[in-house]
Amino acid sequence: MLVTMKEILDRAKKDNYGVTSIMVDRSSLSYEDNIAQTKETVKMCRPLNISVEAELGHVGQSEDYSSDVSDHFTKPEEVKKFVEETGSDCLAVAIGTAHGRYHGTPHIDFDLLKQITDVVDIPLVLHGGSGTGDENLRKAVKNGIQKVNLATELVVAGKE
C-alpha cells in the first residue's frame, strides 16, 4: 500500500502521533521539481509544527559508490535559492558519503562543505555517516555539519 505524504500528515494531525520532524528526499528529481515538491511538503508541515529536512544533491547507496560521485554533489550555487524557496529547516548535503556499508573510506569534499556552509545558516545534515571514520566525522562537524545519520551502524549493532 502506497501512502502519500498528505495521508501521513492527516493521520498525524488527527491521531496526534507526536510527529516532530520528517525527512523529504526528492533529490533524484530535477532541481526545479525538488524545490516544488519540498516546498509543498513544508507547506503541509508548518501548521502541524513539524520540521522538514530536505536533501539537495544526491546521496546514493554505498554499493553504487565510486570515487567519481561528484556529479551528484550538492552545488553551492543552488543551495541558497533552494533553502529560501522551500523553507526547509535543515538540509542534507551530498559531499561524498553514501548510504550503507563502504568498501574503504569515503572521500568527503570538505572544501565543498565549507562553500555550502558559507551560503546558508540552517543546520546541515550528513547522510551515510556509518563507516565514515571518526576523523572525517569530527572534521565534518567542525566544518558545519550539525546532524549525522548513522543508520547502518545501528542496524548492524541491533542484529548482533
Model-derived segments and their meaning:
Residues L126-G128:
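Thr-Gly-centered strand-to-loop micro-motif
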Residues A157:
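Conserved His + Asp/Glu catalytic blocks
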Residues L2-I122, D134-I145, L150:
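Alpha/beta enzyme core
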